[in-house]
């Protein structure tokens, strides 16, 4: 009898610990709230007008980044939309550059910038995320 109680107790403890761990994992699943239609429209207009001050960087942006990052239908984070970039920036610039280099979700490998260096990608990410 004592052995049966001990087994139930271990099983119950296992379920409790599993439930707590699972609950903790669910708490980590968080998405940024979707912007209102008006906010999304403002972000799209802003993204379409922004351009790096540095002419070389501006040429790289125009050639390789603008088509997706200034187009809301592309589902890429819009240039200048800090809220859209916030969760990505939390991953750190090295990981974001790795996503550019290797491709990630809709991002093509190399970001379609075959002449860009890692420093260029760092600068383009900094520009687009501010």
Description of each model-found segment:
Residues 1-27:
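Sec-dependent bacterial lipoprotein signal peptides
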Residues 22-24, 60-63:
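Disulfide-bonded cysteine motifs in exported proteins
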Residues 29-32:
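Bacterial signal peptide processing site
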Residues 35-59, 75-86:
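Electrostatic cytochrome c docking/interface patches
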Residues 56, 60, 84, 95, ...:
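Extracytoplasmic/secreted proteins, especially bacterial periplasmic and envelope-associated proteins
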Residues 61-71, 124, 128:
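The canonical Cys-X-X-Cys-His
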Residues 70-98:
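Gly/Gly-Pro-rich "capping" loops immediately C-terminal to redox-active cysteine motifs
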Residues 78, 99-128:
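Axial heme c-ligation environment in periplasmic c-type cytochrome domains
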